[in-house]
Amino acid sequence: FKGGDPARLAPPIITFLLAPTRSPRHLSGRNSVEPAQNTRRRALKPNQTAQSSPIDFNGWMPENALILGMGGSGISGAIASKMLADASPVPIVANNDYTVPAWTGNATLAVACSYSGNTEETLAALDAAVKAGARVVAITSGGKLGELCDEHGWPSVRIPGGKPPRSQFGFAFTSVMHVLHAARLAPEAIYQAFGSAADHLIANQSNCIERAEALADLVEGKQVLLYSDAAQEGLTIRWRQQLNENAKLLCSHHVFPEMNHNELVGWETGNESHVVLIIQTPEDHKRTRIRMEVCMEIFQQQGADVVVVEGDGGDAVLRFFDLVHVGDWLSLVLAERAGLDPVDIKNIDHLKNALAQIP
């Protein structure tokens, strides 16, 4: 990898199986681990996420929760809100903006996620949430957010710093779930499953890079479109973000069934330059699966390649982490083939420098 050791991104290694068929190809994850095994394993074990100040709500339970964050820090909120949609007793909303909803108040739990601690949108949203009376917990490696926690006595989870935020997903996501579990918004079963997920990913690692390259063969040089069931949108966003940042690709994502009411019409101009990656899980709605099958025929009629990607594992949590790994490694393999540094984010750096000149 250009620019140094790819382990700086601490990515998981992916494997999956290619079905020998000309119809939509199915990729099922089988083995997965990451180079920094001990770091990932520690990050996925409950109560071992990072250095955490006591998080005790003393019986208080929020009526709603906001997870404030952007990019690699904010993806944990997008995924947690979807993963817990059918399990949390109150709404959990991912908030990726400078502002917060008007309903934010003293019954709101605001979880501020900023890896650097200096993300301006997150800090602005946090200020608005505090003024509205929200109760705050922070997840950060330090920076201004860490200073605010020290100043105001807010509980926080301090995660290791010095790496790209997207590479610290294991720490950030499990920290978010740790906070939500403490607030009684994340069920014990999901929370405890992280430990077995770590063991599963470490134990299953044969043929991983070879399999990742097989998927890259199918998408290299193509315009990538990502689709999933709406319940898996957080996962699909993670794939898009990793392809954007690591592989420097423009790609899009949409979800079923909503795309059936708009984007599907746009497929009248689809062609062989497109490749469709459809993420499927056993948890998908049965009617959504039917919609996917019909739409795959439409995509193929327009000349697009269609690949169905499935996760490996005996439960939803294992399959989820497996699919995260598939997307992460796909982005790194594509970056390597293109001679790109997956860590480099020149356009984002340019934007930040320009914004720093304007109060």
Residue positions per predicted region:
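Extreme N-terminal basic, low-complexity initiation segments
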Residues: 1-9
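Leucine-biased recognition of intrinsically disordered, low-complexity hydrophobic segments
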Residues: 9, 17-18
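Glycine-rich phosphate-binding loops that contact phosphosugars or nucleotide phosphates
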Residues: 13-14, 56-202, 279-286, 290-307
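Active-site phosphate/pyrophosphate-binding segments
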Residues: 23-38, 45-55, 60-63, 179-275, ...
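A generic structural motif
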Residues: 94-96, 249-260, 305-314
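C-terminal active-site/capping subdomain that shapes the small-molecule cofactor and substrate pocket
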Residues: 265, 272-346
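Short, small/acidic-rich helices and loops at N termini and domain boundaries
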Residues: 343-359
